[in-house]
Amino acid sequence: MAPADLIHGALVGFEVPAGRGRRLMLTTAEGPFTLIDESYNANPASMRAAFALVGTLPTPQTAQGTFGRRIAVLGDMRELGPRSAELHADLVADLEQNHIECVFAAGPMMKVMFDALPVKLQGVWRTSAAELEPYVVEAVGAGDLVVVKGSNASQMHLIVTALKAHYSDPVAAF
């Protein structure tokens, strides 16, 4: 078997694991939005990489002629030591630089980041992902590009699960 055939065979059934960058196209009553599930792990470098990815992706035009928003839904980064608050607050510049238009946040360290955001970028902050979940589900709309990211212990997967349940018919996973 040729090397290209071996490579093709290995990749045919590959799926990005949940929480590790899987993208889903979910549908609201007004149209689809893209969900990027990065809920498994987070550190300052991976947060910045996720924001950079979102910043490079276009938000599609909706049937109503408007464009979606870039939304970040963020949970605490754990095990950062005594500089944790500073490292969380430092994310603000990257959010702005990558054209994130609305930020939802959960956890005590993300409160530091949330309070440092310009008011126009502030969505909602809550103490936990479970408390934040209904606000995110209500806020997403057609054309939006939504990234959910946080350390596994911050349980941001709850928000991914809620979005998938509420907007239950994925158009595609990629």
Language-model segments: which ranges?
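ATP-dependent carboxylate-amine ligase
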Residues: 1-174
